[in-house]
Amino acid sequence: MNPEKDFAPLTPNIVRALNDKLYEKRKVAALEIEKLVREFVAQNNTVQIKHVIQTLSQEFALSQHPHSRKGGLIGLAACSIALGKDSGLYLKELIEPVLTCFNDADSRLRYYACEALYNIVKVARGAVLPHFNVLFDGLSKLAADPDPNVKSGSELLDRLLKDIVTESNKFDLVGFIPLLRERIYSNNQYARQFIISWILVLESVPDINLLDYLPEILDGLFQILGDNGKEIRKMCEVVLGEFLKETKKSPSSVKFAEMANILVIHCQTTDDLIQLTAMCWLREFIQLAGRVMLPYSSGILTAVLPCLAYDDRKRNIKEVASVCNQSLMKLVTPEDDEPDEPRPVVQKQAGPSPEDCAAKQEGAASGGPDGSCDSSFSSGISVFTPASAERAPVTLHLDGIVQVLNCHLSDTAIGMMTRIAVLKWLYHLYIKTPRKMSRHTDSLFPVLLQTLSDESDEVILKDLEVLAEIASSPAGQTDDPGPLDGPDLRVSHSELQAPIPGRAGLLNTPGTKGLECSPSTPTMNSYFYKFMINLLKRFSSERKLLEVRGAFIIRQLCLLLHAESIFHSMADILLREEDLTFASTMVHTLNTILLTSTELFQLRNQLKDLKTPESRNLFCCLYRSWCHKPVTTVSLCFLTQNYRHAYDLIQKFGDLEVTVDFLTEVDKLVQLIECPIFTYLRLQLLDVKSNPYLIKALYGLLMLLPQSSAFQLLSHRLQCVPNPELLQTEDGLKAAPKSQKADSPSIDYAELLQHFERVQKKHLEVRHQRSGRGDHLDRRVVL
């Protein structure tokens, strides 16, 4: 510094002392400056006051010499003390050079800057608020200062500034928020602590409504919640908890929509605390905002669905996610199936909603995951409409939702509970919005069919519920069930088509009586037939599925849909099956289900009497496919009391190739005759004269069997058939002989028998072709 330079009104002694390396001498100079400035204040000499401040700022505080800078800082503090209440007029000039020194490399100088600014602020009090942003910016940097003395000094200044803000009603929150939003993303532990402490202070001031600006800082708060320091995490939890309480107190002023995606992001983090807190916030948002959250459904489901498969280690997160999922599902109503004209949000007045937590973006937790997150979920969702969203149109856009559900269902690595939740969502959407969902059925159908191979029975049950709803929904009704097949109506698996009402079945000739396909059931739509076709294709390509789960799947479908339609359509489709081995296996499975399942009691009764055209039509349809298995065909005739035709069929068995499998099936049929299902048949043995063909058919089976346990069983049963003369009563002698049950005139049994012969001939040809290929291969090996 040039000693000859004029620093008036500062005296040479003051200048010399300010530049001294000793603190005591600089302090003496500061007292002289204070005295000098007081005189200028008394004289109202603002020109000289400004000159003194400018000199101390430019020539000392911003000097290149460290001792000069220290002198300038203490001098500026002295000016502020001397100015007293008038210091507010000169705050910009007083504060700026001091803040510049906050960045000094010398830690002692940074400490003196803190001390100087403390004195300036202490004198000015509320007058410093217009300069709050620059003060906050400087303090936020010092909060992370490595020097403990500097940090201690900054904490004193920080407390003073907080006191001033708390007692003032002139704080410029609007101007401060951009700075807070920027600083909140600091990764420094101390800077984060500083930020959180200020948010806590601002939240506690009644005149400051920080909730309006929560969307600006919520993401940053969740970032801080993931800090490694326990103390900082706890502070952040407290802050988020306070915000959540305010949200529940004043939901009408909360900008739910602006924060929804923030929560969705943090619900997907790997940090348990962040995820739990974000999930708790999301739960409260869904319950408080109601349909306002619907546009964010796809994101919410992306975050929530994987959590439903968590184990007990993350039970809290799983429970809260489950409530979120249920609450969101309840927001979808039948009105959402109307044309895409946005509906205004309905505002409900509601009582206090259950206590909970908050969260967002990468992390998860805050708002007290301990107690508040465990609150019970009330069945009635309290819905408040935010002021900003009042009367705002809310339309349910299914594209994103269905895409998320489809993605999760297609992911084989996803947990069972998540898959079940996805299927529940799909079922709910098909129930509430069938018209809109029908547009997505083509994309969903393949993955729903694939899900039938799931390892979990519960998943398969839910999957079948969805498929059944698709198959029976009026929204999927079309007039064209599919293209016709070729002249013989036989196609490969990849070309299976839906049966066409009125068209003849496999090997059927024009004009054949009783062999027409029955009309489709009115309650079923085109997807029903597509479902049946693809289900059989799946059974054909995955024989393990048919073996392990086939009966289970078909029985459940009979409960969910119309059993007659299922058997009718499958029988029609099997007529077009080229793989005769699969057709035989499938017929055997269907016959076993028909004869043994309690779910089909009503259908068995319908077939037993053949009193209606529908039942006779069904019998003919089943018969044509049942012909793939001779013994099952006989069992169908027994079920429908067509004993004469059963006897005629058994007579044809002499022309068939009798194999071990064939005899095993006869054995099983004999065992089945002894079951409760055929109680009526056994009772009819008492009326020998009316049922001669039943007895002849049973004797025919007996003659087919070798001397086995089944032979003994049936033989003993037939031995119990009474002598008709012994049963003759006096009234019976007078009465005309009772004829057996008359064959239905609408069924051409001769044609049915011819059909049976044709099918069996086809089976024989296929077996011979296979054996021929086998012999040819054997000869090649020998050669």
From Swiss-Prot:
KW Phosphoprotein (keyword) present: yes
Role description: Scaffold protein component of the PI(3,5)P2 regulatory complex which regulates both the synthesis and turnover of phosphatidylinositol 3,5-bisphosphate (PtdIns(3,5)P2). Pentamerizes into a star-shaped structure and nucleates the assembly of the complex. The pentamer binds a single copy each of PIKFYVE and FIG4 and coordinates both PIKfyve kinase activity and FIG4 phosphatase activity, being required to maintain normal levels of phosphatidylinositol 3-phosphate (PtdIns(3)P) and phosphatidylinositol 5-phosphate (PtdIns(5)P).
HEAT repeat boundaries on the chain: 5-42, 89-126, 171-208, 212-249, 439-476, 561-599
Pfam family, one: Vac14_Fab1_bd
Region spans: Disordered: 331-373
Gene Ontology CC terms: endoplasmic reticulum; endosome membrane; PAS complex
Modified residues (Phosphoserine): S518, S744
UniProt subunit comment: Forms pentamers. Component of the PI(3,5)P2 regulatory complex/PAS complex, at least composed of PIKFYVE, FIG4 and VAC14. VAC14 nucleates the assembly of the complex and serves as a scaffold by pentamerizing into a star-shaped structure, which can bind a single copy each of PIKFYVE and FIG4 and coordinates their activities. Interacts with NOS1.
Spans annotated as Mediates interaction with the PDZ domain of NOS1: 774-778
Protein name: Protein VAC14 homolog
Localization, UniProt: Endosome membrane; Microsome membrane
Modified residues (N-acetylmethionine): M1
Keywords: Acetylation, Endoplasmic reticulum, Endosome, Membrane, Microsome, Phosphoprotein, Repeat
Family of the protein in this entry: Belongs to the VAC14 family.
Residues modified as Phosphothreonine: T11
Domain remark from Swiss-Prot or TrEMBL: The C-terminal domain (residues 523-782) mediates pentameric interactions and is necessary for the formation and maintenance of the PI(3,5)P2 regulatory complex.
Chief place where the protein resides: membrane
